[in-house]
Amino acid sequence: MRKVKADCSDSTGRKEMHGAFWRDQALHDIMPAWLAHGINPASERFYTGLSRDWKPIGTTDQYPTMLGRHLFSLSAAYLLSGEERYLRLAKTTASYLIEHGWDHEFGG
């Protein structure tokens, strides 16, 4: 029978282990790109499909799972930064999701 050895090295020096790394990723790398390219300025709704160079492609249908992910991201960005623009977009997304994402026929 072989023995399995588990070892945890000291990872305190790794940047991925610190909250500032993830906050900076969200607020400086991820959210600015989505705010600049991922939202249709006419409707303030997220594009459903984007090409690798951030050009809208495909359908314009809004899917609850997609909207839920955006709502989570916007809410997290607001909690991390306190910036009102994230809160405003989160509220807009939540309202749209509640209004259009509810299945009145089956109650969910």
Give the label of every model feature segment:
Residues 1-108:
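Glycan-recognition and catalytic cores of secretory/periplasmic carbohydrate-active enzymes
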